[in-house]
Amino acid sequence: MSGTDTHDGDHSSLADKLKSPFHELKDKLKDTHLHDAKVHLNHKKHQIGKFGNLFNPQHRHDEEHEIACDEKRSGIANEHRFKSYFPEHDGNLIKWYVDGRDYFWAVSVALEQANETIYIADWWLSPELFLRRPPASNQEWRLDAILKRRAEAGVKIFVIVYREVEAALTCNSEHTKHALQSLCPKDSPGYGNIKVMRHPDHNVLENAADMTFYWAHHEKFIVIDYEMAFIGGLDLCFGRWDNHQHALSDVHPEGVANEVWPGQDFNNNRIMDFKNVNDWKQNELSKVEYGRMPWHDVAMGVIGPCVYDIAEHFVLRWNFVKRDKYKRDKRFDWIMLQGREGENEDLVGVQRPKHPVGDYIPHPLSPLETKKLKNRGTVHAQIVRSSADWSSGILRDHSIQNAYSEVIRNAQHYVYIENQFFITATGDQQSPIHNQIGRSIVDACVRAGKEGRKFRVIIIIPAVPGFAGDLRDDAAVGTRAIMDYQYKSICRGEHSIFEQIRAEGVDPTNHIFVFNLRSYDRINKTPAIRKQEERSGVEYHEVQRAQAEEIMSSGIHGSKDVEGERDKHMGKAEEQKEHKETQKSLQAKERFEDARRSDEETESTYSVAHHAMAGTGKLADEPWDGEPEQEVHNWVQEELYIHAKVLIVDDRIVICGSSNLNDRSQEGHHDSELSIVMEDTDRIPSTMDGQPFEAGRHAATLRRYLWREHLGLLPPQDHDASKDLNAQPPGEDSPNDIWDRDESYKFVEDPMSDELWEQWTTQATTNTETFRHLFHADPDDHVKTFDDYNIFLPPRGVQAGHIFDRFLPADDIRQKLDQVKGHLVWMPLDYLKDANMAETGLQVNSWTESVYT
């Protein structure tokens, strides 16, 4: 034995001596160009080799270590409710935000307080977005300005945005990346502190096996210092800022410096989509001709253990995109997560290739135990997601759908849904629709009906999906296809929710109610503006653009980003050209303002939308600077676009996040989504159907606030939110202001109250009839065939959204509009019921139908 040991030792010693020179040589070459060249060639070989994955769709899940990791993740998920990878947590402090004013203000405060890290995941991010309004007096609160300040202070900022298919969408994530990464140029404070990833990759040569054209990264969340998170439906982008009165008009005769929505932030997707968003100043939609499309949304602010889970989802996505797209890019490091070290680092996508490029950086940057995530509040919560191989490198996770289905199926009193879409199935017979949240609605209604129990499902969705075009036109077939799937989900065909309930001997009209939201306003194009245009030779539309150029200057951005790249707005030549155009525009604006006369001061306000809210007096008393017949031409209406993705059940449970109610969001392997399921353990005395009831504070106060907004029982909001608790980040010292200081709070306490339901339905009917009478708002139950459009709407080419009968007396219009309170209208369930809404063709066919569901 000893002889063998000696022999082996001598052999080993000889081998070491022979190897030693090569190891020493390898160490010496490690940091040289020769070594870099070798690594580059090695990575190039693997890059070219990715074409082989065309024949192996399971290439991320077929190696032994990948299989082991998948089994580990599945084992974790199988132990959790809804089969979510993330566990349930007690002790969360969660605050709700309704509409963009409050949310963006709170985000601006939270970002400004960041000390270590900021994570942002968005479908679309507009660097030039103003988080506070009006922009002219809030220059320092532009998103890119805030991020620049934090980067210069040493905060590490990580951003992941969806890389759009340019032919289909106008998000221009390339501009987002270059604009953000140019904020801190080389040799300046903050250099390298802002990193932006775009995904998925559309480079055929590098990513042929994993091309994703149909599906998007749709999450919208922020994590700050591992101490606070925001999650919901609001991207940090144009078109989302709004307040509770949801104004349509933004014309200011007293001076364009008072504008609220500059440049492309003033948008109406139903008339014209965003265009060339890298030129954020440009806006082809004239404010003196059209109203904007108002925006309703909901989000959450989180402090507590769920913050870690939201951060973990971001870290997994970051490392997955690093592996998938930036594996050979030293500018992007791997993120290691405290709590997922060692043998568990694969759970967050950390890889250890033979020739790693980029460092391995532990996060958070200070010890996790210093973050004080435990026992922060009273909300029991859980993160759920839609995620899969293409989006996160994991097996399919559809825990959002599981959560929706289970929570709805178990509802006892009511289900309240606000969502951008409503496309769902009741079984396996509604291809191409696969999610079966609709079956849960059927089951809950049938059970209640057979038990003789009062039970309501209240659904609020947009009247029309937010795509441009006249619904009569052939080009709108894609929009009509989405609407067709929604009607088939709700009430058309034997497999619809209505008919499945009716087949069980229960009347669906006693249980299911579907609504839209709609807003009106008056464009403040006064005679004074027309006179200024005549005297100056400058149209107000030009002044509108000049104002956007002045306050949305690109001067904050560098001429190149940190990668030495640029987009169309960057570079010396472009800067010089832009400067000349800006000077020309500003001179035109100056001529226009010089043409204003002191005796032409205006009394009419830029918007009268506040009259739909509480405590605002009568619209009949609102001043107008001009002849009555001129005012008639200036009234406009538009759908109030519901972009919220919120479910509230029985005043106890809330689900909120980025997930729409359709296959794209719910199936897991389509769009990627992140949502949070919440139930407050802090119970407050309440009433349910006339009986004493213990409601969850978080769910009940959110539902009461939303319902009062929709009924017009809340006051309008000022732009300045500095003294509003609802516009502050979550914290023990900034709870939600539930607005319980008038009788309306008590009025909406019982969601099943007959008195409340009578006002809800009566006001919806009044609003619907008013918009029909004055504007012939489209869509409408009077339009059952395409021929009906010839009677109901003005001829093609006539401006949409204005008063239908221009000969109506101005006073009659005001009196009618004074009856509109809130924004609630009935969804027209008979719209085009006798027509083929979506003819099969190039846009809608068996190859493309899944895109619309």
Task: Place the predicted regions along the sequence by residue.
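Catalytic core of tubulin tyrosine ligase-like
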Residues: R652
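Long, serine/threonine/proline-rich intrinsically disordered regions in eukaryotic cortical polarity
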Residues: S2-H65
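Domain-scale recognition of functional cores that engage charged ligands
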Residues: N435-D443
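HKD-type phospholipase D/PLD-like phosphodiesterase module
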Residues: K72-T117, W124-V407, Y414, E418, ...
